[in-house]
Amino acid sequence: MRCLPVFVILLLLIASAPSVDARPKTKDDVPLASFHGNAERTLLNILRDGDNCCIDKQGCCPWG
């Protein structure tokens, strides 16, 4: 029963500790939000272009 307060205090200290990256950042590192934004923009461009080309020509879309 005496260990419970010590355990709770340790959990609080661990949760409030600042996070540290395991490896240093390089110039090639891209934030994940930027990656998701680029992927979404690319997908929207493919879908937008696909709407125009698939009306007249069969097989011109990226997905067949």
From Swiss-Prot:
Record propeptide residues: 23-48
InterPro entries xrefs: T-conotoxin
Tissue expression summary: Expressed by the venom duct.
Matching Pfam families: Chi-conotoxin
Signal peptide: 1-22
Superkingdom of this protein's organism: Eukaryota
GO cellular component term, pick one: extracellular region
Principal cellular location given in the protein's record: secreted
Keyword Manganese: no
Post-translational modifications: Contains 2 disulfide bonds that can be either 'C1-C3, C2-C4' or 'C1-C4, C2-C3', since these disulfide connectivities have been observed for conotoxins with cysteine framework V (for examples, see AC P0DQQ7 and AC P81755).
Family the entry assigns: Belongs to the conotoxin T superfamily.
Domain notes: The cysteine framework is V (CC-CC).
Name under which the protein is recorded: Conotoxin VnMRCL-04
Organism: Conus ventricosus
